[in-house]
A protein has these predicted regions:
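Short acidic, glycine/serine/threonine-rich loops at helix termini
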Residues: 97-99, 181-182, 214
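Extended catalytic-interface subdomain
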Residues: 171-172, 192-214
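Structural core of flavin- and non-heme-iron oxidoreductases
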Residues: 41-48, 54-57, 76-77
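Repeat-blade elements of multi-bladed beta-propeller folds
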Residues: 16-39, 65-93, 154-181, 188-190
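Aromatic (tryptophan-biased) beta-strands that constitute blades/sheets of beta-rich domains
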Residues: 1-14, 49-64, 103-151, 200-208
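Surface-exposed, flexible loop/turn segments at secondary-structure boundaries
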Residues: 38, 59, 93, 113-116, ...
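Beta-propeller blade signature
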Residues: 47, 91, 97-102, 186-201
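N-terminal export/assembly segments and adjacent metallocofactor-ligating motifs
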Residues: 5-6, 41, 46, 175, ...
């Protein structure tokens, strides 16, 4: 017998086979993502009632993302005993949300200078991914947090949620999907890590080893 149905397509067009999110159950609440904008939702598991939602503001980076429909879930951590939901967006931002209210965590990350973004609780992952990458360092243009990486240089996004381990939020990424790649070179898919309490950058694992790293 079906107890209740939660309509994910209330948060954007139905995405058929591409909707792959696995809900996470923590302290009596279900958490998931839904829709092309990867809206985060907290759900009462007894009734199916939506307790809160968060949807990232529109950006050019989101419009260009090839992983809009591929959000697979969220991660959970704690800051001084306070439950925190971590998720990565198709535009490649890391968000830290209060598990009870859905509001962004104070003192985490840095302000993203884009309309609609909160003053705190967000990390622009592109900044750290591009840092020390030679093609970007040679690119004679200022960084635009709305536009992201120029197509001439590459493309990067993410579909998987981060993981939280030993006080660290670890973030992966995704390049172009499928077997029909459009470029020979792309942004390296390096793994990024951040402090779970502050959002401060901790380390980067180079998938393509740099001199002296092998």
């Amino acid at each position: 017998e079906v107890a209740w149905v939660w309509q994910a397509n209330n948060y954007g067009p139905e995405v058929d086979y591409q909707f792959k999110s696995t809900p996470t159950y923590i302290d009596g609440i279900l958490y998931t993502v839904a829709g092309q904008r990867r809206t985060v939702a907290a759900i009462d598991p007894a009734t199916g009632e939506t307790l809160w939602t968060y949807r990232e503001p529109n950006t050019t980076r989101w419009e260009r993302s090839m992983r809009q429909n591929y959000g697979k879930g969220v991660a959970y951590g704690e800051i001084d005993g306070r439950g925190v939901i971590f998720y990565t967006s198709p535009a490649f931002f890391l968000h830290a949300l209060d598990a009870k209210t859905g509001r962004h965590i104070e003192g985490f990350g840095a302000r993203v200078p884009l309309e609609g973004f909160p003053q705190t609780g967000v990390v622009d992952l592109l900044v750290d991914l591009l840092d020390d990458w030679a093609p970007w360092e040679a690119w004679d243009q200022p960084y635009d947090p709305d536009f992201g990486i120029p197509r001439e240089l590459g493309f990067i996004t993410t579909s998987s949620p981060p993981i939280v381990v030993n006080g660290t939020v670890v973030v992966g990424n995704s390049a172009e999907q499928g077997y029909n790649q459009t470029r020979i070179e792309n942004v390296p898919g390096d793994i990024l890590a951040y402090d779970v309490s502050t959002g401060d950058f901790k380390w980067k694992f180079h998938f393509i080893p740099r001199p002296g790293e092998v």
